[in-house]
């Protein structure tokens, strides 16, 4: 199209009759919003994939996922840049229109020029309006040239503004053949599971049937040999009574072995009771008591022979301070009320307490070794210190 061949009425009417630059401004705003959304999505994708593949999800599957998503993230970043470029070009097109609109002659001026020319021509009877008609024609020519120049400039600016990079198709991040491969794998797994279930259902009765017979019925296995050595039969017992019968020899052996110490102690007790009954033990006790009395008669002479005074002894009497009984270390020497041991202490037989029951292996344990447990120093021992009572002086 040659804008120079069109009269100014056409060019001016076209510029003033259209929607103006509002659609291009709206398009620029929309492209800006799309660019921002694509950029935000690309940044979010990259952040999430990086955190997921480096912290929460590791391994070959994570690496494959990150490698597959990387081209798509790059495409979104490129698309965001292209959308920003489109917004810039749309703003440039709107600016070009505004410039062309400002340079275009308004249609009312062109219409006024044409009306003035027609009036001058109609009244030019004697040629008196020739100069005015020429001036009107010259003004119209200038309007034509101005509109043509504005349209040529607008066409050039629009051509530059429309030069945008075309958008590319987003990459395919999923394997097109993966769905078929997955379906085949699922079918194979289902077939394997079905065959396994069939084998299990078929083999279950056989396994249960094998439990109805003794486990060691065969005499060739190593367990059969072991059972033969222990119990003299290669067959495993099929009932509790048969098992107890096989274990009877071992039970008797363990019972006799465990009861052997009790048998020895019982025999010893029987011998002691028999000796008491026959008087072998009771007749020796008076002789021992008499011998002890004879030995005690020589105690007074022992003190004189050693150069000391007569031996004094007291039994069952504590030292006293006033009417209070005190330890011997508080009162010094024994009081004069204690008679010297001129005569031996009377010795008499002391009968033992009657035996409540015959002795056994599980009698009292000897505690003689525990007598000195508190005498020596002990680690971590904290002695108890008692305050001196007021009556002690």
From Swiss-Prot:
Keyword check for Kinase, yes or no: no
Could you tell me the keywords of this UniProt record? Virulence
Task: Name its GO BP terms in alphabetical order.
Answer: response to host immune response
Do the record's keywords include Membrane?
no
Q: How is it used?
A: Candidate for development of a vaccine for the control of tuberculosis.
> Which positions are tagged coiled coil?
none
- State what this protein does: Probably plays a key role in regulating innate and adaptive immune responses through human Toll-like receptor 2 (TLR2). Interacts with TLR2, leading to the subsequent activation of the mitogen-activated protein kinase (MAPK) and nuclear factor kappa B (NF-kappa-B) signaling pathways. Stimulates macrophage activation by augmenting pro-inflammatory cytokine production (TNF-alpha, IL-6 and IL-12p40) and the expression of cell surface molecules (CD80, CD86, MHC class I and II). Also participates in adaptive immunity by directing Th1-polarised immune responses.
- Which family does this protein fall into? Belongs to the mycobacterial PPE family.
Quaternary structure note:
Interacts with human TLR2.
What protein name applies here? PPE family protein PPE26
């Amino acid at each position: 199209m040659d804008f120079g061949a069109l009269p100014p009425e056409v060019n001016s009417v076209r510029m003033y009759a259209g929607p103006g630059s509002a659609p291009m401004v709206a398009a620029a705003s929309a492209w800006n919003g799309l660019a921002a959304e694509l950029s935000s999505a690309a940044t979010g994708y990259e952040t999430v994939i990086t955190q997921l593949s480096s912290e929460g999800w590791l391994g070959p599957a994570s690496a494959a996922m990150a490698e597959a998503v990387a081209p798509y993230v790059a495409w979104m970043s490129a698309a965001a840049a292209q959308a920003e470029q489109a917004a810039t070009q749309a703003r440039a097109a709107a600016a070009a229109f505004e410039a062309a609109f400002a340079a275009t002659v308004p249609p009312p001026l062109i219409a006024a020029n044409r009306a003035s020319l027609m009036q001058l021509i109609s009244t030019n009877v004697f040629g008196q309006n020739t100069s005015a008609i020429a001036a009107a024609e010259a003004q119209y020519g200038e309007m034509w040239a101005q509109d043509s120049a504005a349209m040529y400039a607008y066409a050039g600016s629009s051509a530059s503004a429309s030069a945008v990079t075309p958008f590319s198709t987003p990459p395919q991040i999923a394997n097109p053949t993966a769905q078929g491969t997955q379906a085949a794998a699922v079918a194979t797994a289902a077939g394997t599971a079905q065959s396994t279930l069939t084998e299990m259902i078929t083999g279950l009765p056989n396994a249960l049937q094998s439990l109805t017979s003794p486990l060691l019925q065969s005499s060739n296995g190593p367990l059969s040999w072991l059972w033969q050595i222990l119990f003299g039969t290669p067959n495993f017992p099929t009932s509790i009574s048969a098992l107890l019968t096989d274990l009877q020899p071992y039970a008797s052996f363990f019972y006799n072995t465990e009861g052997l110490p009790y048998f020895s102690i019982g025999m010893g007790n029987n011998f002691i009771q028999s000796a008491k009954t026959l008087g072998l033990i009771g007749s020796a006790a008076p002789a021992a008591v008499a011998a002890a009395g004879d030995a005690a008669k020589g105690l007074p002479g022992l003190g004189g022979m050693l150069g000391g005074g007569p031996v004094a002894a007291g039994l069952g009497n504590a030292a006293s301070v006033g009417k209070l009984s005190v330890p011997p270390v508080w009162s010094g020497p024994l009081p004069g009320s204690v008679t010297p041991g001129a005569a031996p202490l009377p010795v008499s037989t002391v009968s033992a307490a009657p035996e409540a029951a015959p002795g056994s292996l599980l009698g009292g344990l000897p505690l003689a070794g525990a007598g000195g447990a508190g005498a020596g120093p002990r680690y971590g021992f904290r002695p108890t210190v008692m305050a001196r009572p007021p009556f002690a002086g």
